[in-house]
C-alpha cells in the first residue's frame, strides 16, 4: 500500500513541474524576473507542501529570482489549482537549485588538474 502513495506523489511532482514550468515562464515575461526554469519538484507524502527547485540563467540573480517567485507563490498556486484535478494543491516553497553551479565548479577543478600538454599525450598515445 505505501508504494502506491509514493507513486502518486511522484506523478503529482511531475505534473506540478510541467505545469509550473509554463507558469514560471509567463511570470518571467510579465514581472521582469530573471530567466529561469523549474528543475525539480518534491512533494511531501501528505501532499501539503511542495519544494520547487529552480535554475537561474544568471546565477548572480538567483536571490532576486527566488524572492520574486516567493512573492508570486499564491498566484502560481491558484493557477495550478485551475489546471490540476486535485482536492488540495500543495503549498509551494521555492529554492534555488545550485547543482549546475556545483557541476561547473567540479568541471573547472578537473580541467585544472590535468595540464593541456598531458591531456594531448593521453589522447594521441
Swiss-Prot record:
A Gene Ontology molecular function term of the record: ribosomal small subunit binding
InterPro entries for the chain: KH_dom-like_a/b, RbfA, RbfA_dom_sf, Ribosome-bd_factorA_CS
Keyword annotations from UniProtKB, A to Z: Cytoplasm, Ribosome biogenesis
Pfam family, one: RBFA
Main location: cytoplasm
Location(s) in or outside the cell: Cytoplasm
BP terms from Gene Ontology: maturation of SSU-rRNA
GO cellular component, one term: cytosol
Top-level taxon of origin: Bacteria
The keyword Amino-acid biosynthesis appears for this protein: no
PANTHER family, per the entry: RIBOSOME-BINDING FACTOR A, CHLOROPLASTIC-RELATED
Function: One of several proteins that assist in the late maturation steps of the functional core of the 30S ribosomal subunit. Associates with free 30S ribosomal subunits (but not with 30S subunits that are part of 70S ribosomes or polysomes). Required for efficient processing of 16S rRNA. May interact with the 5'-terminal helix region of 16S rRNA.
Family that this chain belongs to: Belongs to the RbfA family.
Subunit composition and interactions: Monomer. Binds 30S ribosomal subunits, but not 50S ribosomal subunits or 70S ribosomes.
Record's protein name: Ribosome-binding factor A
Amino acid at each position: 500500500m505505501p508504494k502506491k502513495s509514493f507513486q502518486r506523489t511522484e506523478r503529482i511532482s511531475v505534473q506540478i513541474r510541467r505545469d509550473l514550468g509554463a507558469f514560471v515562464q509567463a511570470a518571467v515575461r510579465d514581472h521582469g524576473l530573471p530567466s529561469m526554469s523549474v528543475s525539480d519538484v518534491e512533494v511531501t507524502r501528505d501532499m501539503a507542501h511542495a519544494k520547487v527547485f529552480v535554475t537561474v540563467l544568471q546565477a548572480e540573480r538567483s536571490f532576486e529570482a527566488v524572492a520574486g517567485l516567493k512573492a508570486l507563490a499564491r498566484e502560481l498556486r491558484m493557477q495550478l489549482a485551475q489546471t490540476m484535478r486535485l482536492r488540495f494543491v500543495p503549498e509551494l516553497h521555492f529554492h534555488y537549485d545550485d547543482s549546475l553551479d556545483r557541476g561547473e565548479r567540479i568541471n573547472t577543478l578537473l580541467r585544472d588538474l590535468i595540464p593541456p600538454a598531458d591531456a594531448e599525450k593521453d589522447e594521441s598515445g
